[in-house]
A protein has these predicted regions:
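Disordered, acidic Ser/Thr/Pro-rich linker "stalks" and the adjacent N-terminal cap
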Residues: 1-55
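Extended, solvent-exposed segments with strong compositional bias
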Residues: 93-127
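Aromatic, loop-rich ligand-recognition surfaces of beta-strand-rich domains
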Residues: 38-94, 126-160
Length: 160
């Protein structure tokens, strides 16, 4: 059966949502919250980091990731992406393993969602995200900022 991404390149339909994991999340059902565009944040009093583990139904070609955050204080400052690395833990994702691509500063701007929400687009090195069956996203703010990290949605763009 031939598969195709949405006309606008949205790969949400290619994510195997039943297999999605979110490490260090405060919410009881973080995968469902992400799928519905709800906020997912790190545990209070813990380290301000999240690790999203996203399996795909079939291999995709990822071109861009768009993140949304509820407010500037909790928006990720550091993002590390890992292609096809299913065995990551938080220590690996934070720096113990080499990332496929990494950002240490994001350009956040107003989100279409409004209400103080922000959005940032990450353009990927397309050649590094071909034949992608699994994506891990590590999101963090600096520990000294004292805030938890939070995202309230993301969009994966590419091709099947």
């Amino acid at each position: 059966v031939a598969r195709a991404a949405a006309a606008d390149g949205d790969l949400a339909g290619e994510v195997d949502w039943a297999g999605v994991g979110v490490l260090n999340a405060r919410e009881a059902e973080p995968a469902e919250a992400l799928r519905a565009g709800g906020a997912v944040s790190s545990e209070e009093g813990g380290s301000p980091e999240l690790l999203l583990l996203l399996p795909f139904v079939s291999p995709v070609k990822l071109q861009a990731v768009r993140l949304e955050a509820p407010e500037a204080a909790r928006a990720p400052k550091r993002v590390r992406l890992f292609a096809n690395q299913r065995d990551l833990d938080m220590d690996d994702a934070a720096g113990g393993a080499a990332a496929t691509q990494e950002w240490t500063e994001l350009a956040w701007g107003p989100s279409a969602a409004g209400g103080g929400a922000l959005a940032a687009s990450l353009e990927l090195n397309f050649l590094k995200f071909q034949n992608l069956g699994f994506l891990a996203l590590y999101l963090a703010v600096e520990e000294e900022d004292g805030a938890s990290v939070a995202v309230q949605g993301f969009r994966l763009s590419g091709r099947v």
